[in-house]
Amino acid sequence: MIFDVLTLFPEMFECVLSHSILKRAVEKSKLKVNLINIRDFSKDKHKRVDDYPYGGGPGMVMMPQPLFDAIEFVKSQGNIPVYYLSPKGKIFTQEMARELSKMERIALLCGHYEGIDERVYAVIDGEISIGDFILTGGELAAMVVIDAVTRLIDGVLSHPQSALEESFSDYLLEYPQYTRPEVFRGMRVPEVLLSGNHAEIARWRRQKSLEITLLKRPDLLKKANLTEEDKKFLREKGYEI
């Protein structure tokens, strides 16, 4: 998969792409990230990309010319959708990550300052928000999207089942995880996980996943694909279905 990232700070991505799963994805040729410096498209002799807002107000606004030219440069290479990272966008979810992972190539536009000139919306295809809070720029949000999407691409994770069992994969939060030692400061690993009975382990994990979701994110249960056994378990916990 190819990501075209339009940004004023391409160097910010060098670290995240040089470690862990993203690094391995690049090495396996499962991921390619083209870092495109918006400033390179500015026609201003000082390479300015921002100016004061019409009507007054605090801060600066990213100018349309460099953004239009940068986006048109990307779109000239094919039918590539451009998504603007913005707090006004559609909330990024695991479901959205899954849909994006099926695409061959997408572009992410990272805003800065007080945002972009409104006319730039004419050449973008959508907006993505990673939550109801404000960041200095879209770079961190773009990194979140790239990471979440990349781990869903076939062949990226060493154990594909990991992606299926993680939180939000089926609108349920993940079950508790344990590793060695068996006892730490008086706290023991649940006996069922040591039993070797895979059916009982799977049942325990499913019930713990349901229990944790009910406790921390009950809103997700309305979207989850629940079995009759799941529903019975939740009713016993006081959840009305």
Curated annotation (Swiss-Prot):
It catalyses: guanosine(37) in tRNA + S-adenosyl-L-methionine = N(1)-methylguanosine(37) in tRNA + S-adenosyl-L-homocysteine + H(+). GO terms for biological process: tRNA N1-guanine methylation. It comes from the Bacteria. Keywords: Cytoplasm, Methyltransferase, S-adenosyl-L-methionine, Transferase, tRNA processing. Its main location: cytoplasm. One of its GO terms (cellular component) is cytosol. Its EC number is 2.1.1.228. Belongs to the RNA methyltransferase TrmD family. Specifically methylates guanosine-37 in various tRNAs. This is tRNA (guanine-N(1)-)-methyltransferase. The lineage of its organism: Bacteria, Bacillati, Bacillota, Clostridia, Thermoanaerobacterales. The gene is trmD.
